[in-house]
Amino acid sequence: MKKTLNDKAYDFIVHKLSSGEIKPGQKLSEPSLAKACGISRTPMREAVRRLIEEGVLYQIVKSGTYVTGFGAKEVSDAYEIRSVIESAMLVEALEKLTRKDFAILQDTCDRMHAAIEAMRKAKMDIMTGKPENDFLKADILFHLTLLRASGNSLAEKIIVNAYRRNQFFGTHSHQRTLEHVALAWKFHCEILKACRAKNAPAAVKWLQDHIARSKHDALLPISRVSSF
């Protein structure tokens, strides 16, 4: 499916946020963004509106549009919402997962592993660039596949918003060392293994342990900064 100009504008801002080029608290200029993206202001305005609805941006009357600032509480809240909703939806999804779903889940685990191997081959201390991008895409697809299998579209929307926040403001707080990404991959593999066995308690435990560890790793750099 061909992307609309609205989607192009949205993806453009998302990339700027994810790369850290646009930072929390920064004021945005729609005309400048539209020019840099090579589109008119209308689709850029729609993209900004969409990100405001997702809580990533906010507007101040007669002042402008700003990137939401995220501290420890906001990061913690996003992970806690994920843990509660994803756990409940995982139980719902367990009896509904299809062969296609399992194929997607396995593929995401394989892609995460391939990204880790690319990291090893490049002798990276911290996963960055294409390996990181591939790893994160596979990570979120794994979780979204489980959510969609539950059939609860509202839960999916809430979690996507939480993921967006973690993606924009957690990507650069995480130190994606080999240990970090290898453990995340292991969590996904164990969740998949429990799902195949239709073992709900085990699947939920692995999921909650995974989210708890991700929350810990995301908050650690914030706590270090605040301690100075």
Model-derived segments and their meaning:
Residues 93, 150, 173-174, 222:
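Helix-loop junctions at the membrane-solvent interface of multi-pass transporters
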